[in-house]
Amino acid sequence: MRKILGRALISFFIILSSVGAQADSLQERILLTFIPNIQFAPFYVGIADGHFARQGFDVTLEHLQEPDVLDLVAAGQADFGIVSGEQVILARAKGRDVVYVYEWFQEFPVGIVMVSDDGGADLENLTDMTVGIPGRFGASYSGLTTLLQSAGLSEDDIELNEIGFNAPDVFCLGAVDAAVVYVNNEPLQIRKRVAAGDCGDVREIAVVSVASRVDLVSNGLIVSADLAGRDPDKVQRMASAFNSALKATINNPAAAYLASGTFVETLPGEPALLTLLRELAAEQAVFLETDPTREEIAESRSDMLVLLADAVGSDDLTQFEVLLRTIALWDADTLGHSDLSSWEAMSDTLRLMGLLSDDPPDLSASFSNQFVTGIGE
Amino acid sequence: MAEVGKKHDTELGSRSTRTLLLQLRRSSPLLSLVALLLLWQLLTSAEIYPAFIVPPPAAVGEAFIEALQSGLLLKHLSVTLEEMFFGLILGLGIGLSIGYAIAKMPILEYTLSPVIVAFQSTPIVAYAPLLVIWFGSGPTSKIVTTAVIVFFPSLVNTIVAVRAVSPNLRDLMTSLNATPWQTFRQLELPSALPVVLAGLKTSATLAVIGAVVGEFVTQGSGLGFLVTSARNQYDTPLVIVTVLTMTAIALSLYSFVVLLEWRWLAWRRRSKP
Amino acid sequence: MKLSLRELVVDFKTPDEGRLPALGPISLEVSPGEFVCIVGPSGCGKSTLIRTLAGLQRATSGSVAGDDVPITGPLATLAIMFQDANLMPWRTVIDNIGLPLELAGVDKARRHAAVYELLPQLHLQNFALSYPAELSGGMAQRVALGRVIVQRPKALLLDEPFGALDAMTREKISLELLDLWREHRQTVVMVTHDINEAVLMADRVVVLSSRPGKLVADIAIALERPRAINMIYRETFLRLVRETRAAIDPPDA
């Protein structure tokens, strides 16, 4: 009796594991944060244009809370996730053995927007000002702490208001003098309102990005240390696939925008805009054949925007502009590479915020450039 | 002599067995708790999930003591309790009085029911952010979320309870020339009390949800905030401590209502000898 | 108290706005201190008659009066008792009996004095602090009776007060009621469906026809008081019962 039961159990587990294994070789989940958005364009390009498939992955995307992404990857429930470096430090301090293997955002995306009469920005002016922030958590809060620290200020020197993700409204209503924002998004919306005379008596704004002051580690690809040790080939293939998708997105944002349409339901897609984008994408593909330099490609992106702005209303173009500004945060000579100094800067900020105890964490084990080096050209 | 001794022994034996069984029965709720703890310990020992996802009981116990000593738990607990207290008073007050009015005036039910049903069938989590915008990120919005979630069961139970008052007893009160206040105080109130208290049990446990939902929306203080903040700091034991604290509040409130039932509804425990 | 019905008619509204005649026209006079039983086929409007006298039901036409004063609502001097003991389950025996006094604003000490004085007559002295759930049907009905008596009413209106009790209890409690009545001498109008009970207790038995109830017989009961249970074997008793039964079910009908 016991034997039969044992055999039944064993065959049950064999079936289970074979189902699991089969799914494993085909399907791969990548865990993202936030919601589907144009800022995840490299993943949409990677799926739509076969960058993942060429490395043997059939990728599905899921959006979760950042701590959940981290725990699921750390527990081996999912192999790949995208989180910010700050979360990696915090989670490692609490026993999650994850490794950051590919730096996606080369620049920390947070900054502070404030009224400026002459276009100049001086952080010291923040003293006694009312500053809006989504909340005392996440990248906005660590970004603000770093900025204040870099200006020799602290949270006590300003009046901090939790305003949720409503910076353009609250700022233009005059309820705050400055606001912590994502530099690739809100400043764009505020500038449009200023231009339309729809932002109170604000004539000019200035943005100080964290990246302009301190190099802080930002979003990147994480895997569990276990996976990195057990199956480095798989990690390498994912790093290569993402690298190739990211590069394609940077090089041809028109094509990337088109590829994102299927994934981001709310993305503006008027026929006129799409037709124009298709033409631009085809022209860009030809241009890329000529092996242009990074600077030349950056210039071609600006040209695209000028061309589009002439033909399409500016409201429909906002998301494309967000994409271009976000690309500026990704672009670098060597994509994916992470510096120890940016990790140290982040760790200092976290300690300043009281989120990290004083014993220094082993930051060099938090990340690895091994898989970036391993990407074949 | 030996016979007698034997008999005595068996009697003693059977009595002690009976006492043991009685004690087992009395302590059975405690036993289920112990069993739950054992199962939890077993699960963590089996390492199906790593400790950072399912921490062992001991780690949670440590986190509890630490959170207690640092004052962190009590600080956020008192915030949540205050919101719940005022939310309960507001929600029950409105629910009981509107419920009574509806029970007495059917036309009111006809007029109000679409609003009330719509209100009830909309999940509070969906519009809690709006309440925060309307009532600010301070305690008021959390008091309102609590009140809203508590309101409905107290309303429905009040209507049902007042409608269920025996028409014969109403006749009796009329024949005795009772004033409306006397009818309320001597007939409707005691007659409706069992059902209203049953509704209060539901409301009491829902109040915790109301306050915590409000705290999830605005980050600041309270157990809802503590759970998010612990989660963001990857402190799973503290997450569990906070969740268990919420459970404890709900259970205490529930027990408090049971106590009220015990005191106020003593007559229900009486029956023919 | 003298009770009088003059050309009383009571109709009920039906859901389709029609009118369902329930009672009358009927005229009847009950002298002070008289014990009148009302019998009739079920649905003849006996209960409606009692409820109208108690001021719980409005007359459609005609009038009801107590001591020649029209009855338009409940009176403190006119107490009604129902078939169901109708006790408040959350009140003890003494608090149930004392309810009318409490509603009338009598203070606790005087209320308790009045109630405790009644308890022995009701055979409830050992149940003062019991709750209704702990009482038998007969005892519950005694409590209901106590609640009526304690008001010291001038007239008692009893709507099948013992209808839900078993035969033995019913007989016993009927005679107890007669004892109480002999002591206080209120006017009593009692509805019953038991002809033996009616003849045994009443000075007059009034027979109503089927709906809408009209007066078909008014039979004087010439039996001496105090009544006793063995009277039911007397020839006079049996004749009166036969006479009453014939009025309810006419042999030629």
PLM regions with names:
Chain A
Residues 100, 160, 249-260, 360-362:
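Surface-exposed patches in mature extracellular/periplasmic domains of secreted proteins
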Residues 1-9:
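Bacterial N-terminal signal peptides that target proteins for export
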Residues 23-55, 325-331, 336, 340-377:
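N-terminal hydrophobic or amphipathic helices and topogenic motifs
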Residues 60, 67-68, 207-210, 275-282, ...:
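Short linear loop/turn motifs
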Residues 230-355:
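Secondary-structure end/capping motifs
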Residues 86-87, 166-285:
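Pocket-lining segment of extracytoplasmic ligand-binding domains
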Residues 24-164, 168-173, 177-184, 202-215:
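Short, glycine-/small- and polar/acidic-enriched structural segments
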Residues 8-17:
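Bacterial N-terminal signal peptides
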